Regions:
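Compositionally biased terminal segments of proteins
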Residues: 2-214
Length: 214
């Protein structure tokens, strides 16, 4: 079972995940570079029927790859649910290129922040049949803070400066607003401050850094 890297009482520890994990690709599944992500999404779009354009909102490693914070990822996560025709198109592209069956999935939809606003998203692909939006980085930050796996911590460090938070306290306030069902974490500001301090020396995550288990 995957373990979650969490911060409490001034230090990091490994605990059980706070939510169910998407089945992970095997080590033989090809990594998705930004160019591959765009190409495969266009192929998906071209397989969709005319007259009913669809939309996904990408988050996580795929969005960070598209924005230049990573060189690659294992899958494309959407916080907007995929319809049947979209899932069928995803499966066809997977068969065509030997990808994981759920290389594009909506498993993250259940963990969308309550602060998420689709109108604030960036447009990453504007195809007549498929619009691909990118979630605002501040929303991605709180989602990754919620997941808190090892690679999420690395991603948080990489994107901190680009998120535009005025302070660790502001980021913590957004986190608690995004997930109001969680108990108040008195150590969260210190955790975020540590991420921000490491963020000044952040670099793009290279291909060899991507762990297929994360």
């Amino acid at each position: 079972m995957l373990l979650q890297l969490s911060y409490s009482n001034g230090g990091w520890s490994l605990t059980s995940p706070v939510y169910g994990e998407t089945p992970k690709p095997s080590v033989s599944d090809p990594l998705l570079t930004p160019d591959r992500i765009r190409a495969y999404l266009i192929e998906v779009a071209e397989l969709l029927p005319d007259g009913s354009p669809q939309c996904i909102v990408v988050v996580g490693g795929s969005l960070l790859a598209l924005l230049g914070f990573r060189e690659a990822t294992n899958d494309v996560d959407s916080i907007k649910r995929l319809g049947t025709s979209l899932k069928d198109a995803v499966a066809q592209v997977a068969d065509r290129h030997g990808l994981a069956p759920r290389w594009l999935n909506d498993s993250a939809a259940g963990f969308a922040p309550q602060t998420f606003d689709e109108s604030a998203c960036s447009v990453e692909l504007d195809h007549p049949r498929l619009r691909v939006l990118g979630a605002p980085l501040q929303q991605v930050f709180v989602m990754k803070l919620f997941a808190a796996r090892a690679l999420d911590i690395t991603d948080l460090t990489a994107i901190w400066s680009a998120c535009g938070f005025e302070s660790p306290e502001q980021a913590a306030d957004l986190y608690h607003a995004a997930y109001p069902h969680l108990e108040w974490d008195e150590y969260l500001v210190d955790e975020i401050r540590a991420i921000g301090e490491r963020g000044s020396g952040a670099r793009t995550i290279r291909l060899g850094d991507v762990d297929p288990e994360l």
